[in-house]
Amino acid sequence: MRMQADDFDAHANDSAVVYDTQGNRIGTMGYTAYWYKILKSGSNRIFDVITVATFAPDFGYKCAKMSVYLGTNKANHEVLEAANIVSNGESTTHSISLSAQKKGITGGGSTSWTYTVDAQTVTKQFDMQTNDRTWIFKPKNAGNGDAWIEEPGIRMCATQERCYTTVTLSCPFVTILGIELNENTLSRAWYIDY
């Protein structure tokens, strides 16, 4: 699955100002969703949706937990894959190798590096019987006014021309004293014709 927002076929965005129960502004949240058409064969369409979600509390507030939902309840759709965003304490190893040959001489080299995540815990709610996936992000040390950007994605198959995806962001903002305010939700269903 592509995990970069480049060369996309379609995109959409939504955002909202977040208010407390007295109507005072306490931050913003929003996203841009990118669609990539992967394969069209007969009535089947395979596409990726990558969402760049931003949770931005104002100074005096912080994010203690954020979630991003991607999927659809429409018939004729199936989630094939979902991004595995690593969690606190988990590590990812990246490798690269190069080789070359010219006139019987061969050379090359390789390297690898490991990165261990220590900024947040990520819980994945991936029920394989449904066509939705939810990532829940809990910052290890949520700072006052710190914004968080998360980039989950899914690969879906649709057996129709109109390909649907719902994007939902949820986040209760928290005061610096640890008092959790309203659960704030931003949700919209989108489609592309493919």
Q: Where do the PLM segments sit?
A:
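Surface-exposed charge patches in extracellular/virion surface proteins
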Residues: 2, 25, 40, 74, ...
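Residues in intrinsically disordered, low-complexity segments of regulatory proteins
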Residues: 34, 46, 112, 134-136, ...
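Membrane-insertion modules used to breach or fuse lipid bilayers
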Residues: 83-131, 163, 167-193
